[in-house]
């Protein structure tokens, strides 16, 4: 029996009718498109039999070229040849200039601080450049399948944030594509291998592409793919190997650091060729800018060893997040062209204690998995037994009184997901509530990331705690968040979709998770202090209201005792002694017990006035 049947509304295929769908691996260095034909997933080649499409676009005044043709212009027209645009997706111009100071492009900032690249075709943003790559892939698929595509699944790094995911969807829309779903790249690889092997157990997906590194721990059980945890670094990949080797060649050749763009591109091309050759050979001869020399695999390994070590540290963190030991991992799936580097395979095998899987071409495995998923989502496989569960990278929650963060959805919760939690008002007569959406693992607002703010108005004017507001967090299959707040008695509501202009990198996410562990004890103490201060404020607010209304119920001496207790509480609440605040609250409660009882008696008498015992 099928565990889950998924199809887009109106796209469920009629009997004997297949809809055309494709999986697209929109990569940093290379991109691919794949489809399912005769029950087999396969990548689609161009007229020359090449499956990879370089993620490069060359712009001219009268048009543009994509792929191999564009790449040949890289050395001749560097400023108009855009490569690795995926690294720019969802980032601010300031962030790009800080992270990638040596890019050969000229940038301008848009009104909201986002990057615009100066080209012969005008100012272009990363979304437009990505759309041109997607158009080229779609054209290849349309020609190969002899028909228009009904839908596509596009893969993204597991740590892409909301802005980067939304940018990818916008690029697809600009390219005229109907996006069935965005799919995490490691998850796509798990689909490809899971269907082939039919095994059950824990799998690690080690994805080292041109521009990003992702590590995911998945559990396969009875056809269910569950992502236990993800991690990685969106600013680490094979491109970094290339640049390290290019810098090494430049030093050996005595080429000035500030040489022109053409020489820089020539150096990079020589480094890429050398890296590829060193996957099979022990040494390689390099000719560049009139210099000739030899580079050994051992020298190359020394250059990249620190970067490979960084990937393994991320693996260790993600295993801990998943609650899994390395020896529990049944298989290690290698994804991305950079996993062909012998040192990478060797170190990964040593770390997990088993040789990694490489039976599916690591360049193609993600596109193949995306094609399989697209075939299901478009309605061609109504009996599919595969259920896919992704996760969110950081906890989502709300700011509460005292600058605290109340987590609504913990990190590594599977998506799509919807969670609701009830909150209430703090003050008497409160008719509005500010909703502050937070992301992070720490206990205090100041240590987490603000995602969005909105207000819920029209709350009934009731005593503090009288109104009940249900806040619902919903994360869709693409990892995009919407938050809705509703007052339960009236049904009044407000909502917001969280689409930040640019977001966190995965290394920043990893740093936030690490900080939450490092400061765990300190954060708990800070939360306890903040909670006691909030409670002190609530007690004093309630007491002042009661005294204003019914002070006549107290003698002068009784009033003085209560005032003294309240003054002491107000004083200690300004400090950092949790126990002192707690004791002062208890003292106020003790000194006001008789006063509270008299107020209750008075309220009862007022309620019964004019009524007989029989009526009661």
Curated annotation (Swiss-Prot):
InterPro entries documented for this protein: ATPase_NBD (IPR043129), Heat_shock_70_CS (IPR018181), HscA_NBD (IPR042039), HSP70_C_sf (IPR029048), HSP70_peptide-bd_sf (IPR029047), Hsp_70_fam (IPR013126), ISC_FeS_clus_asmbl_HscA (IPR010236)
Top-rank lineage group of the source organism: Bacteria
Job of this protein: Chaperone involved in the maturation of iron-sulfur cluster-containing proteins. Has a low intrinsic ATPase activity which is markedly stimulated by HscB. Involved in the maturation of IscU.
PROSITE patterns for the chain: HSP70_1 (PS00297), HSP70_2 (PS00329), HSP70_3 (PS01036)
Protein name: Chaperone protein HscA
Native organism: Escherichia coli O17:K52:H18 (strain UMN026 / ExPEC)
HAMAP family reported in the protein's UniProt record: HscA
Disulfide bonds: none
Example GO biological process: iron-sulfur cluster assembly
Lineage: Bacteria, Pseudomonadati, Pseudomonadota, Gammaproteobacteria, Enterobacterales
Name of encoding gene: hscA
């Amino acid at each position: 029996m099928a565990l889950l049947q998924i199809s887009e509304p109106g796209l469920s295929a009629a009997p004997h009718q297949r809809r055309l769908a494709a999986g697209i691996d929109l990569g940093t260095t290379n991109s691919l498109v794949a489809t399912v034909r005769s029950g087999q997933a396969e990548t689609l080649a161009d007229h020359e039999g090449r499956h990879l499409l370089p993620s490069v676009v060359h712009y001219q005044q009268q048009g543009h070229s994509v792929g191999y043709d564009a790449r040949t212009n890289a050395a001749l027209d560097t400023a108009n040849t855009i490569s690795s645009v995926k690294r720019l997706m969802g980032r601010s111009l300031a962030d790009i200039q800080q992270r990638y100071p040596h890019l050969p492009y000229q940038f301008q900032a848009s009104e909201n601080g986002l990057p615009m690249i100066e080209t012969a075709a005008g100012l272009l943003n990363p979304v437009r450049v990505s759309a041109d790559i997607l158009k080229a892939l779609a054209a290849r698929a349309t020609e190969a399948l002899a028909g228009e595509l009904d839908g596509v699944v596009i893969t993204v790094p597991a740590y892409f944030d909301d802005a980067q995911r939304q940018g990818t969807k916008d690029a697809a829309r600009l390219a005229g594509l109907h996006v069935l779903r965005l799919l995490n790249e490691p998850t796509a690889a798990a689909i490809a291998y899971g269907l082939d092997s039919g095994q059950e157990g824990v799998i690690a997906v080690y994805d080292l592409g041109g521009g990003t590194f992702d590590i995911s721990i998945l559990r396969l059980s009875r056809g269910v793919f569950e992502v236990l945890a993800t991690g990685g670094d969106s600013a680490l990949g094979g491109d970094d190997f290339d640049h390290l080797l290019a810098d090494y060649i430049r030093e050996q050749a005595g080429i000035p650091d500030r040489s022109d763009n053409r020489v820089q591109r020539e150096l990079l091309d020589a480094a890429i060729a050398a890296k590829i050759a060193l996957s099979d050979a022990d040494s390689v001869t390099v000719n560049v800018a009139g210099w000739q020399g030899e580079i050994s695999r051992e020298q190359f390994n020394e250059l990249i060893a620190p970067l490979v070590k960084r990937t393994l540290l991320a693996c260790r963190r993600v295993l801990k997040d998943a609650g899994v030991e390395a020896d529990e991992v049944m298989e290690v799936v290698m994804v991305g062209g950079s996993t062909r580097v012998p040192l990478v395979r060797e170190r990964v095998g040593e770390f997990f204690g088993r040789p990694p899987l490489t039976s599916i071409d690591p360049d193609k495995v993600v596109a193949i998995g995306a094609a399989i998923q697209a075939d299901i989502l478009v309605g061609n496989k109504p009996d599919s037994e595969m259920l896919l569960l992704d996760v969110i990278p950081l906890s989502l929650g709300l700011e509460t009184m005292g600058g605290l963060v109340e987590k609504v959805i913990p990190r590594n919760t599977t998506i799509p997901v919807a969670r609701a939690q009830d909150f209430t008002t703090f003050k008497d007569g409160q008719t509005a509530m500010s909703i502050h959406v937070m992301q992070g693992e720490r206990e205090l607002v100041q240590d987490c990331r603000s995602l969005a703010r909105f207000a819920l108005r029209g709350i009934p004017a009731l005593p503090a705690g009288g109104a009940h507001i249900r806040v619902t967090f919903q994360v869709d299959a693409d990892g995009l968040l919407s938050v809705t707040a509703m007052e339960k008695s009236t049904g009044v509501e407000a909502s917001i979709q969280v689409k930040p202009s640019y977001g966190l990198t995965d290394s920043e996410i990893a740093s936030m998770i690490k900080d939450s562990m490092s400061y765990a004890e300190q954060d708990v103490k800070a939360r306890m202090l903040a909670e006691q201060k909030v409670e002190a404020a609530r007690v004093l607010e309630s007491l002042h209201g009661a005294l204003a209304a019914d002070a006549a119920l107290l003698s002068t001496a009784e009033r003085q005792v209560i005032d003294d207790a309240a003054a002491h509480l107000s004083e200690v609440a300004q400090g950092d002694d949790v126990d002192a605040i707690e004791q002062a609250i208890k003292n106020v409660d003790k000194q006001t017990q008789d006063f509270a009882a008299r107020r209750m008696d008075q309220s009862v008498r007022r309620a019964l006035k004019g009524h007989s015992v029989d009526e009661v």
